[in-house]
């Protein structure tokens, strides 16, 4: 039987928080001390053509644990208690009981933190082999200094001379990879490795015949660029579903069931999920094993596991944020947690719409502009979104950034502009992405990783905290006893007022 624990006193919570912080600091120092100096991989003579081959089906090799048996687990970047509970088929309460040092208000676990987790065994757990670290998955700090254009120019594959129309302009193959990498916040190295593994993009002179280069069959998504878009979307679906504790099982093309090993990391599970959409049997197991994509990545860019970069540190906290509209104004909360970019996970975004007597797409009054939710520097501003960099280092791949979508072109702020909280970003509109009505779409990223809008690191806007629903776009904003429910209907129950003055 699963057990629950009693409520903890404030004294225990404060003591646990202090002890947990101490361990977090110690673990951080140890990890930094062990971090090697990693240089960019040699761009010459590293490309090894590889196609999917046969391999036996690997298993996790885990024993049939007794119900509630305590197992050892070392926390990984981005781990949260709710997700760990889903992965190990247990409860947050039981994890807390087994690890009393963890405070009740814990967000992310400190990477390297040793834990005991009560496990409830499930059959068909997959391989324990980890093919890619999380920092090599996202478009984060580990990608700084890497030039996709220079790398592709040093190769002899078809991508070098590829040209396509993407994002309202003609782009080279390298520019196309960077465009997809920026929008989905995915590592350009990973996208290049995927293109090489599945199509020989860096070693073969000709593009493989057929409409669906990567094997992802969907109407109107033909050709390398749109296939790469589908691949990026699928990868994000897998990565962030694992982050949220939702991807505990999936099927291969032959309908065989896979349950990712609970000890897995998000990037490796994402690749397992991605290849499950394409293959079955030996071909699937080869693609996720050491001789599959992982080998191609290492041949191209070196061993990613030598880089000790941590994407999400322990006890991560959101900085103070205000609503994305003027103080004293009332807007409608039109959509709860939904995709940050693309479709499906990550459910990182919220939508707000200004008051209006009309529905659909319309031009707003001049005082209904979208505002900065915090002080920062504008590092990207185009139809694909505005990025507000809160640490002002000029790079959206580091630290906290805020993402705005659907700002009108004629009023959009420009790159390089430093803003204070409450200052204009642009007018809400229907421009950019898919939209059925004038609104602004906002999301957060940290070190290149989309931060889920609900959960342990939920949006907190002026004390209003996001709660998720059963489906995308459902959800609430709660402050004390007050609850606002998201609805595209923009009725009275969706209205919320900004009460924080501009600086």
Question: Model segments located where?
Answer:
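Primarily a LysM-type cell-wall glycan-binding module
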Residues: 54-93, 113-115, 119, 131-132, ...
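Short glycine/threonine/proline-enriched tight-turn/helix- or strand-capping micro-motif at secondary-structure
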Residues: 313-316, 320, 331-373, 404
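Zn2+-dependent peptidoglycan hydrolase active-site motif and core
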Residues: 364-415, 437-439
